[in-house]
Structures are given as C-alpha cells and as structure tokens.
Amino acid sequence: MRLPRRVEDAAELRKNLKPLLEKRRRARINESLSQLKGLVLPLLGAETSRSSKLEKADILEMTVRFLQEQPATLYSSAAPGPLNSYLEGYRACLARLARVLPACSVLEPAVSARLLEHLRQRTVSDDSPSLTLPPAPAPAPSPPVPPPGSSGLWRPW
C-alpha cells in the first residue's frame, strides 16, 4: 500500500479500508462468541447438538446467567489465603460436578450418588479446617556439577 499524497487519497484509502476493518472486527466477535459458546454450554448442561444454532444474544445471556450463578467470592478483589482458596476451589468443583454428573451417562446413578456423597463428606466447614493443602510438588533434583577444570567426558585413568 502506498502513502496518501493528497487529502482525497487519504479519504479514499479510509473508504476502502473501512469495510475490511469491519469484516475483521465481525470475524473476531464471531470467533469469540463461538469459543464462549463452547465453554459455557457444557457448564450449563445444555445439549450442544440442540444448541448448535444459538443466536449471539442467547450465548451472551447464558454466559451472564452462568456468571451470576457463581459465588461472589470467586470474583472478590481480596486475595484469600492458600487454604481458603483451595477449599473454595474444591467446593466450586463439587458444585459443578453435582450439576453435571447426574446428566452424564458415564456412571450408573447409584455410583454417581455415592461418589458425590463421598466428595461432600470430604468438604470441610470453615470452622474446622482439618483439610490441609495438597503437598507441593517436590523440586526436580539438580544434576551434579562437575568440578572446574574437568571435562565432561569420563576417562578410566
């Protein structure tokens, strides 16, 4: 593309670029909405085959509804301690699992109910924090450092 030499050239260039820029903007919006749909529909338990032709407004409304259903503590600005953060994450995961697991046909209903009950029993109230954080991964051992002046090759002498 060449640089405009006159004001008319600049106006013509803008006129030609405007539809291109609008097309790119719409493509970005549509791609983001498609990704949002793929993320939110499974969390809401909606069938993807039935919802393949959702309108953009429907996707945005479902996303807003999903975010409103989330506990407000997830979005608070104060950073919780590691134990509280772990417990909140555990509870959020359990709540999501309780919504999704019954609709899933992978497990028998009795097994699903037993699993959920077991996980609920592992949930600890805020009053008795007996649940500890999972152990941090052990650091990888560092390779031995050869003494200065020696080569990296092994020699029998």
Swiss-Prot record:
- Region Disordered, as annotated, extends over 124-157
- Kindly give the InterPro entries that the UniProt entry links to this protein: bHLH_dom, HES_HEY, HLH_DNA-bd_sf, Orange_dom
Q: Where is the Orange domain?
A: 86-119
What SUPFAM superfamilies has UniProt attached to this entry?
HLH, helix-loop-helix DNA-binding domain, Orange domain-like
Transcription regulation among keywords: yes
Q: Where is the bHLH domain?
A: 13-70
Q: Which PROSITE patterns match?
A: BHLH, ORANGE
User: Which molecular function GO terms apply here?
Assistant: DNA-binding transcription repressor activity, RNA polymerase II-specific; protein dimerization activity; RNA polymerase II cis-regulatory region sequence-specific DNA binding
For bias type Pro residues, the affected ranges are 132-149
Q: Localized where?
A: Nucleus
Q: Where is this motif: WRPW motif?
A: 154-157
Q: Which UniProt keywords apply?
A: DNA-binding, Nucleus, Repressor, Transcription, Transcription regulation
Q: Does the keyword Transcription apply?
A: yes
Output a single Gene Ontology CC term carried by this record.
nucleus
The function of this protein is: Transcriptional repressor of genes that require a bHLH protein for their transcription.
Q: What is known of its domains?
A: Has a particular type of basic domain (presence of a helix-interrupting proline) that binds to the N-box (CACNAG), rather than the canonical E-box (CANNTG). The C-terminal WRPW motif is a transcriptional repression domain necessary for the interaction with Groucho/TLE family members, transcriptional corepressors recruited to specific target DNA by Hairy-related proteins.
Quaternary form? Transcription repression requires formation of a complex with a corepressor protein of the Groucho/TLE family.
Q: What is this protein called?
A: Transcription factor HES-2
Organism per entry:
Mus musculus
Q: What is the lineage of its organism?
A: Eukaryota, Metazoa, Chordata, Craniata, Vertebrata
